[in-house]
Amino acid sequence: MAEKQTAKRNRREEILQSLALMLESSDGSQRITTAKLAASVGVSEAALYRHFPSKTRMFDSLIEFIEDSLITRINLILKDEKNTSTRLRLIVLLILGFGERNPGLTRILTGHALMFEQDRLQGRINQLFERIEAQLRQVLREKRMREGEGYTTDENLLASQLLAFCEGMLSRFVRSEFKYRPTDDFDARWPLIAAQLQ
């Protein structure tokens, strides 16, 4: 029984990895059908539906992976690092690095892969970005408590500016068919971003 569950879990992971790879390839710029996905995995469409009731559930699983990866790592940064500027830099670098290492998932983060899917999926990505923005806002607000001095600019504006930078770099990565990596020249870009944090 345990072997059967492991095999099923492995097949589910194989399906999700194939979907992510298809999103990374030129297929990712078009609608991915279950027929194409089944052919990529080497199974029938019926076999796909034994593991996932719908393509929407496949995307849900990928979004769940994105959420878990980013939020868990952001929480680790907040736990381990106390300096506000360093926290912000590491969170931004985390988001950009995650996108760079997972090009197919970046198409989901930018909404590009979700254009032909249910609106609910885009809503989940919107909620993820709202959670990240709320965490950035909290880090910015805690500066006064941690370092004795806050920002002169409203923390809401600063948090949205940081997130807009991340979203812009991820969109540029997708638009360029993954040519312009989000972390390229990050050490040169960060002082420009940090200069806005006043």
Swiss-Prot record:
What name is this protein filed under? Nucleoid occlusion factor SlmA
**A Pfam family per the record:** SlmA-like_C
Which SUPFAM superfamilies does this one have?
Homeodomain-like, Tetracyclin repressor-like, C-terminal domain
HAMAP family, A to Z: NO_factor_SlmA
What domain of life does the UniProt record list for this protein's source?
Answer: Bacteria
Alphabetically sorted, this entry's keywords are: Cell cycle, Cell division, Coiled coil, Cytoplasm, DNA-binding
Give the family per the record. Answer: Belongs to the nucleoid occlusion factor SlmA family.
